Swiss-Prot record:
Residues given in the record as ATP binding sites: 8-15, 35, 124
Annotated source species: Chlamydia trachomatis serovar L2 (strain ATCC VR-902B / DSM 19102 / 434/Bu)
Example of a GO biological process term: tRNA wobble position uridine thiolation
Record-annotated disulphide pairs: 100-194
Task performed by this protein: Catalyzes the 2-thiolation of uridine at the wobble position (U34) of tRNA, leading to the formation of s(2)U34.
Region (Interaction with target base in tRNA): 95-97
Protein name in UniProt: tRNA-specific 2-thiouridylase MnmA
Annotated segments matching region Interaction with tRNA: 144-146, 301-302
Catalytic residue positions: 100 (nucleophile), 194 (cysteine persulfide intermediate)
PANTHER family: MITOCHONDRIAL TRNA-SPECIFIC 2-THIOURIDYLASE 1 (PTHR11933:SF5), TRNA 5-METHYLAMINOMETHYL-2-THIOURIDYLATE -METHYLTRANSFERASE (PTHR11933)
Native organism taxonomy: Bacteria, Pseudomonadati, Chlamydiota, Chlamydiia, Chlamydiales
Amino acid sequence: MRKTVIVAMSGGVDSSVVAYLLKKQGEYNVVGLFMKNWGEQDENGECTATKDFRDVERIAEQLSIPYYTVSFSKEYKERVFSRFLREYANGYTPNPDVLCNREIKFDLLQKKVLELKGDFLATGHYCRGGADGTGLSRGIDPNKDQSYFLCGTPKDALSNVLFPLGGMYKTEVRRIAQEAGLATATKKDSTGICFIGKRPFKSFLEQFVADSPGDIIDFDTQQVVGRHEGAHYYTIGQRRGLNIGGMEKPCYVLSKNMEKNIVYIVRGEDHPLLYRQELLAKELNWFVPLQEPMICSAKVRYRSPDEKCSVYPLEDGTVKVIFDVPVKAVTPGQTVAFYQGDICLGGGVIEVPMIHQL
């Protein structure tokens, strides 16, 4: 008897090709499932759930597969969006995509897969592992690899997941979509955070977190060099949007004192205080047993390079990460993912004291 695979379909080209490839294999009963996590946007928003669902309908019709829709809007706001706002208000820089994968796609969506009597869940993520029992590894396309975003998802939650695109390059996926005549073949990839769309981040955040004007201080001179509308609008290492003139070198956000509502900056992109030799990580998720010390590499943000490091477990359940070479703009609240080669060992949330606290 054929097993049933539920394809998480977003209306984009990646999930469309996943459904196409699985249907073409002839080994599965393929069922599409569209997940709505966010309502329609206002006049400046770009998160177009209705248009995306129409594309899912078109692909399902082309492939002659059944499809369903499920709304997790309420749960998304409670488990992802509310935390996103809370973390920003407290001075952190969270990653909602990592949260969404852990809390929604590979938790609530998995429960829906069981309801539909699915044997597997297939997604368009560019990574490898899952149902093959190997945990999680990078996708072979270095420009599209998404293992970073899944590093916080428990291994058990991936045990029935298929990643058909993990061994493919994006150019190949586009080519397959075009040759198959899929309706989404030329559709642009979605970018950014779904609930923000193309709006400037500050204009979005100020709808939910009130402005709180304060001083911008040069950390080296302790002189006030400007004013800000809220320390929560800034992230460590940020250069743009400071509105500070008259400086010989560009200014970068070094630290934030949320209690005193101060943003500290330094001048020059290579200022030594912008670099950290170590960090702490909490809310850890491991795909392999943690050894002491674990010699590996770490990625402190999605597009950052791997940095060689040693990971030491601490008694309180966190880990200390010591880098071989100091790393720039280590940001509290961001996700850190650990690797050995292409294998993702796990991940956690960065917890590092601000410079002014040291």
